[in-house]
């Protein structure tokens, strides 16, 4: 899993600027333990996760971030498991830069990438990146109607409690 590989590269060369990319299935499912321990260790790397809430490259199975009730190839009667919330997990495990972006807002996403890369310590940017083939629920239109920037709310980044509360919202409002 990618965050484990990135962690090893950083340990081998502390001067290297490490940027790791992956998907929600790899990062939060298959590599979930690597994600947790990289955050816990506050390893100085940037982890960008394309979160499409489905295993898109393996033809549409439920992923760790799939919503309850989502019909997929592996859950034809709907997903029955609570989705993992990578933002609250990262905060609670000690990541020192935690952000969420939406791929439809390229400027905001690029700004978060720059901030994450400049940050000293573990930075994670979870990017809502709709799968146009297998996730027909969480589409670009779905996110365009709901996404709001947390910084527009004058959020205090040191307020973990409010950050977690806002990260748990996934309905009419979704904060990035």
Language-model features, listed with the residues they occupy:
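Short, well-ordered, mixed-charge alpha-helical segments that flank or form enzyme active sites
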Residues: 27-30, 54-59, 64-65, 107-109, ...
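Structural motif
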Residues: 16-19, 44-48, 88, 96-99, ...
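Thiamine diphosphate
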Residues: 1-56, 111
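Conserved thiamine diphosphate
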Residues: 63-116
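Short, hinge-like loop/turn segments at secondary-structure boundaries
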Residues: 38, 63-67, 141-144
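Solvent-exposed alpha-helices and their adjacent loops that cap or buttress functional pockets
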Residues: 11-14, 20, 38-40, 82, ...
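Flexible, low-complexity linker and terminal segments
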Residues: 131-176
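ATP/pyrophosphate-binding catalytic subdomain of soluble kinases
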Residues: 95-136, 140-143
